[in-house]
Each structure stands twice: as structure tokens, then as C-alpha cells.
Amino acid sequence: MMYHIPGVLSPQDVARFREHLEQAEWVDGRVTTGAQGAQVKNNQQVDTRSALYAALQNEVLNAVNQHALFFAAALPRTLSTPLFNRYQNNETYGFHVDGAVRSHPQNGCMRTDLSATLFLSDPESYDGGELVVNDTFGQHRVKLPAGDLVLYPSSSLHCVTPVTRGVRVASFMWIQSMIRDDKKRAMLFELDNNIQSLKSHYGESEEILSLLNLYHNLLREWSEI
């Protein structure tokens, strides 16, 4: 399933990120890509050796960790170190699949269950640059407001279309979920959403407590910690 997570960064945070990123050192985006991806990748990424990068990636991690909807949809166990990319002058990233396992600075390695893109450019400021994701439900074309995030299975083929005007800047990362199976994770997310909706309409009740108990028992049964 694909999820739109709005308001991960406020407009003020986005403006500050953009100001800092204009001062950043950018390198060829292929430095973080395997052999297959390097053949179709043409973009730039912030140099991960800089102090500015270290500060910005930490802010992204803090923002997603504090976002309740992101947590409910992803049920994250491990988050990769966020990266930052930039597309301009017809730069693009052709169809590719993300690697199943990535190195992780604390855990040694992590499984990539979910991929996330946090948009940092207003959609009106550039042409093209759509994230295109192919999954079992068809093809999805994504171009979200700055500060919003899209979450989708890392197993999906995806691409970024050429940016023909302006500049598209984003942060991206991978998530190892406590729930490996996409369908089980989607069921838990739907159950959680319905529990929260019932609580907001009717307050606490024995029935809602029973549903909450069911949610946590399923999470206990399915989670990998």
C-alpha cells in the first residue's frame, strides 16, 4: 500500500531546509547506488561527509519519529540515515528497484520494507519530477506539497520523471518495519485508524478497549523485534 503522510515538516521548517540546502555541497547521486541503479540514475545528492548533512538528516529523523501517522503506517523498527537529492535540467532516475538490504551505522544492516520520500520543493516550482510507483494496484504518480511524505513498499518498481523546469529537492530513506508483511501491516493500520475514529466520536468504551486489545495482540503476534 502507498500512504500520503501530510505535514511532516511545517512550511517554516521547509523554508529553513531549503535555505540550508542551497549552501550544501552536492555530489553525483550515483555514489549511493548499486550497479543496476547507476545505469538509470542522473541526479545529485548532498555530500554525506559534511557537518550540514549530519545536522539536516538528524532533523528529518526527529520529524518522522514524532509524526503519529508515520508511525502508525510504517510501524518502524529501524530507519536508515536520510539522504537528500536534487533534480534539475532534465535530470531523472529511471525505473529501478531498491536493494533489499542496506548497511546501517548502528545495526550493521537492515531490511528495506518501506521507502519514503519527503518533498522539500513546492510542486508549482518545477515541471516533471513525479515519483512513479508501480505496484499490484497499478501505476501511481506522486507529486506532493513541500513538507509532505509518501510511503510505499520498497519492493515496488519506481522512477522519477525528468525535471524540465525548476528544481526538485527531497529527502529519502528506507524503513525496516516491525511487521515484515505488507498486508498485515496494512490491516493493522486500518484497524488503528478505525479505533482512533471511534474514540473521537464516542469516547472510551468497553468495545473500543476490546478492539485496542485485539490490535496489540495482533501486533504482538506478528512483530519482529
Curated annotation (Swiss-Prot):
It is an enzyme of class 1 (oxidoreductase). GO terms for molecular function: 2-oxoglutarate-dependent dioxygenase activity; iron ion binding; L-ascorbic acid binding. InterPro entries: Oxoglu/Fe-dep_dioxygenase_dom, PKHD_C, PKHD_hydroxylase, Pro_4_hyd_alph, Pro_4_hyd_alph_FE2OG_OXY. Keywords: Dioxygenase, Iron, Metal-binding, Oxidoreductase, Vitamin C. The keyword Iron applies. Residues 78-177 form the Fe2OG dioxygenase domain. Its EC number is 1.14.11.-. The lineage of its organism: Bacteria, Pseudomonadati, Pseudomonadota, Gammaproteobacteria, Enterobacterales. This is PKHD-type hydroxylase YbiX. Binds 1 Fe(2+) ion per subunit. GO terms for biological process: DNA damage response; intracellular iron ion homeostasis. It comes from the Bacteria. Its cofactor is Fe(2+); L-ascorbate. 2-oxoglutarate binds at R168. Pfam families: 2OG-FeII_Oxy_3, PKHD_C. It comes from Escherichia coli O6:K15:H31 (strain 536 / UPEC). Fe cation binds at H96, D98, H158.
